[in-house]
Amino acid sequence: MTGFVVTVAFRVKPEHRAAFREAILENAAASIAGEPGCSAFDVCEKADGSEIFLYEIYDDEAAFKAHLATGHFKRFDALVASWVAEKRVLTYNRLNPGN
């Protein structure tokens, strides 16, 4: 195994999309800068703005669990809880490094 991948799809309530976008970009930057076990944290948005998709790569599942325990993640999660209409989380074992 060459990593642990997490994908998250958020459907955000329209009135909170701009604030959510700002909050997730801040969380992503903090994850890359402050978590040695996080090697990628891509934030993507559907063209119509209706969904935000995250693609995160961690060294292993333990590094992802450490991410969930960080202060910046806990703040983000509490902040956006009422802004999110739907959240889907999937995890994968990465079979090959893409770059």
Regions found by a protein language model. Name each.
Residues F4-G34, D42:
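N-terminal first-folded block
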Residues V8-A9, G71, N96-N99:
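Short flexible/disordered coil segments
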Residues A18-F20, E51-F53, N99:
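Short acidic, gly/pro-rich beta-turn/loop elements at beta-sheet edges
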Residues T2, D42-S50, D77-N99:
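Glycine-rich beta-strand-turn "strand-cap" elements at beta-sheet edges
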Residues F4-R11, A40-L68:
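Short, well-ordered beta-strand segments in beta-rich or mixed alpha/beta enzyme
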Residues E26-C38, I57-T91:
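An amphipathic, aromatic/His-enriched active-site/gating alpha helix that lines ligand/cofactor pockets
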